[in-house]
């Protein structure tokens, strides 16, 4: 199952709101192993593999090939409420892994068109779908006892037994709105983090969320360019509630939670690390998004975290704009206001108050044979998103890049080759140069799905006032 994406696999993609902006992917291989993905298409295809649904799949290999079956309950999906007849975008595909990767589909894709969902066939019907309350209750009981041995040899000294009772609630209020709640959540059965090497890293490592309460409906909180809600900063919640949904062109999300072990990311332009507040905090996050035109979006997000003598509040506006079927603009403006606690002031040398802004733009063109991009970021020195992930602040950055691909016949030894190159330059807010980077690589694809890549990176970097030249080459 871990290599399902590299297998011969049948894929069903459904755009249940027919908004041509997001959808659900369901993958099944010949042995019936399954995978599911929540995808978005507001700026090209983007996949979120952390999404999980409960559904059934089966597969059988026969003399002519193989057959797969999928049984997806409606409660695993979200779709419009109060409509007599629904229209869903859909595509059925097969990744046919042979000497060359073929993708077979019920419809053809124009690779000069950046969006994929807008090219899907439409399925009309579902007039008899009844909205169920769809209540899921998951009680938990956790017991813990620590025994100690004071002398060797000797007997164990039995410790006290600590018992905690918890409850998770998932309530489908309607077909397009879900309420989640949790009391003393038990995350002991959640899969562990992937091993990350944190040696010689100046900026904090990003870890993916794995906890079910935070994963359900997580896509409703996502903004265009900044990660304003990084739920891994909420380490030990005892109470939490969340409402997510979509009605017509309007999507909304609201989350409230407390935290007994609050972690805060403290960034600079030279590095970042987490600070523990050692006190209980309350957290809130909300987002509203409106689907603008055929493909675009505009949204407003806010997060707030507070304790007795501390608060951090962030307000942001963002969106995507499609000039045509291949050219898009992403933008985001954000403002943060912080009052630091005495603990943070004394232990991390912070001022009593911090307030600043952040801006970002990204312009891209995606065509079949080439792509271009330009980006700009301006992050203030005192900009902090204590519920989000902003590992670097106090900088201004510009970047340009692009690439081109040449396609050859599928029977040739070399089926395609491409190049990509980019340049970016970063300054501190006081004007000092932080980094200038040039990067380029060549990629060759051939038979047996073989890939050969060669690349070079030149980086001129300022670290604590000292400049370093880095020249990196790689072959893959």
Region locations from a protein language model:
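Transmembrane beta-strands of outer-membrane beta-barrel pores
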Residues: 30, 74, 94-96, 143-147, ...
């Amino acid at each position: 199952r871990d290599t399902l994406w590299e297998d011969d696999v049948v894929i069903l993609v459904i755009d249940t709101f027919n908004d041509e902006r997001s959808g659900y992917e369901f993958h099944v291989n010949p042995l019936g192993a399954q995978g599911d993905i929540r995808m978005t298409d507001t700026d090209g295809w983007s996949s979120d593999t952390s999404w999980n649904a409960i559904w059934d799949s089966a597969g059988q290999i026969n003399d002519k090939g193989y057959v797969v079956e999928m049984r997806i309950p409606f409660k695993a999906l979200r779709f419009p409420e109060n409509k007599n007849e629904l229209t869903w975008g859909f595509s059925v595909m097969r990744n046919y892994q042979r000497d060359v990767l073929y993708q077979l589909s019920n419809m053809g894709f124009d690779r000069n068109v950046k969006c994929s969902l807008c090219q899907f066939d439409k399925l009309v019907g579902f007039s008899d779908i009844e909205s169920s309350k769809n209540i899921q209750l998951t009680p938990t009981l956790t017991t813990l006892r620590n025994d100690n041995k004071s002398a060797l040899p000797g007997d164990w000294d039995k410790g006290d037994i600590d018992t905690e009772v918890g409850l998770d609630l998932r309530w489908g209020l309607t077909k397009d709105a879900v309420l989640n709640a949790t009391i003393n959540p038990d995350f002991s059965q959640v899969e562990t983090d992937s091993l990350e090497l944190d040696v010689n890293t100046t900026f904090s490592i990003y870890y993916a969320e794995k906890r079910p309460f935070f994963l359900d409906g997580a896509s409703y909180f996502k903004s265009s360019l900044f990660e304003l809600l990084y739920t891994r900063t909420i380490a030990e919640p005892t109470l939490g509630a969340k409402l997510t949904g979509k009605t017509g062109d309007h999507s909304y999300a609201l989350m409230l939670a407390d935290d007994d072990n609050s972690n805060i990311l403290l960034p600079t332009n030279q590095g970042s690390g987490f600070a523990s507040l050692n006190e209980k905090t309350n957290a809130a996050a909300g987002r509203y998004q409106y689907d603008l035109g055929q493909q675009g979006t505009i949204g407003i997000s806010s997060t707030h975290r507070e304790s007795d003598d501390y608060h951090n509040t962030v307000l942001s506006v963002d969106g995507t704009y499609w000039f045509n079927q291949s050219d898009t603009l992403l933008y985001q403006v954000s403002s943060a206001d912080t009052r630091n606690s005495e603990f943070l002031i004394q232990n991390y040398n912070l001022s009593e108050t911090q307030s600043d802004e952040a801006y970002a733009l990204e312009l891209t063109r995606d065509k079949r044979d080439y792509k271009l991009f330009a980006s700009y970021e301006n992050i203030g020195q005192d900009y902090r998103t204590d519920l989000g992930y902003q590992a670097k602040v106090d900088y201004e950055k510009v970047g340009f890049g692009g690439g081109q691909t040449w396609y050859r016949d599928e029977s040739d030894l070399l089926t395609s080759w491409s190049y990509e190159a980019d340049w970016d330059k970063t300054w501190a807010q006081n004007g000092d140069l932080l980094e200038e980077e040039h990067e380029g690589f060549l990629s060759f694809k051939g038979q047996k799905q073989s890939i050969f890549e060669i690349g070079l990176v030149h980086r001129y970097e300022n670290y604590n006032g000292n400049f370093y030249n880095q020249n990196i080459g790689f072959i893959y």
